Regions:
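C-terminal substrate-binding/catalytic lobe of Rossmann-fold NAD(P)-dependent oxidoreductases
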Residues: 13-45, 57, 145-146, 150-151, ...
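Short amphipathic alpha-helical segments
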Residues: 127, 228-231, 298
Length: 312
């Protein structure tokens, strides 16, 4: 049976990519609202009442408004409300929403599949959580470890205004931002990894449209048990064994990594680069997650979750 899907905010960067990915997916029918009715609550509510699943590609406040609209719809009609995937950050730590990272832990994929409401992870958070959670679960990384997360994304991560600035040539080639140290992805990183100490998250944007690297530097000699690079690699490998989208790769001998290699895919690659046998006695590692910020970091993840929820 064909499932009807409405993308609320389909004209935005993430919405457009989700629409493109769904157009060739068997078993779904995309339902759109006329452009002049996008801000008409009655028209939107009526359309939501006709579909099986709504994907929210909106700013946080607008996403909350749409969820309230769906709640009102269900209360007034007496019919089951449509299922929701929210790509905003509004519900990523909400207790009544399922976090849409199926690889998070055993049972998470089943939780997403049966969920009424799924909150899509943030792009940076996807990489950070993918690196940190397995190490905490394996007992290699205490939850109160002081961590830093220097990361870089393509300019599409900044939305329409940043895209226009870079594509017009008016933006810098590389820029560190978020230096108020209050980035909206930090709460979900802490919540879904079990960290008890706030990590120092340092995002940057480069002059390329899509792609992302999330880095996790570690002083291995300062961690309890002094884990080796092999210990870290094995913990990640065990956690993601059998995953279709998350893979643990060997560190390349060149010691470099291209941020653009996974563009237009839903893949997430994890690597451990290390110097854990240095003559000075200090043991260092940097773990790196590579993904497409608009793929596994946004639209690809939304479609992955949709397919689980609808059994496609």
């Amino acid at each position: 049976m064909t499932k009807k899907i409405f993308i609320d905010g389909e004209a935005g960067t993430t919405g457009l990519q989700i629409r493109e990915r769904l157009q060739t997916l068997p078993g779904v029918e995309l339902v759109s609202i006329e452009p002049h009715l996008r801000k008409d609550p009655q028209a939107k509510r009526a359309l939501m009442g006709q579909v099986d699943l709504v994907i929210l590609c909106l700013h946080d406040d607008a996403a909350r408004e749409s969820v309230a609209m769906i709640d009102e719809l269900a209360a007034s009609s007496g019919k089951p409300d449509p299922r929701i995937i929210d790509a905003s950050s509004a519900h990523r730590v909400a207790p009544d929403w399922v976090f849409g990272f199926p690889e998070l832990s055993a049972g998470q994929e089943a939780a997403v599949a049966s969920a009424q409401r799924v909150s899509n992870p943030g792009c940076y958070a996807t990489g950070a959580i993918a690196l940190i959670r397995p190490l905490i679960d394996a007992g290699l990384l205490p939850p109160d470890t002081p961590l830093s997360l220097p990361s870089v994304t393509g300019y599409s991560g900044g939305g329409r205004s940043m895209i226009e600035a870079y594509e017009s040539g008016s933006a810098p080639a590389f820029e560190v931002y978020g230096l108020g140290l209050k980035h909206k992805h930090v709460p979900e990183i802490m919540h879904h990894t079990g960290l008890t100490r706030r990590p120092l998250f340092i995002p940057a944007v480069g002059n390329f449209r899509q792609g992302m690297l999330v880095q996790l530097p570690l002083h291995l000699d300062s961690l309890p048990g002094k884990p080796s690079a092999r210990d870290l690699h094995d913990a990640l490998t065990k956690h993601y064994q059998g995953s279709a989208w998350v893979t643990v790769e060997a560190a390349n001998p060149e010691g470099k990594l291209d941020a653009l290699a996974l563009v237009d895919t839903n893949k997430l690659e994890l690597r451990v680069f290390a110097n854990d046998a240095a003559k000075d006695g200090f043991s260092h590692a940097v773990l790196i997650a590579r993904l497409d910020n608009l793929g596994k970091g946004a639209s690809g993840a939304a479609v992955q979750n949709l397919k689980l929820m609808l059994g496609l």
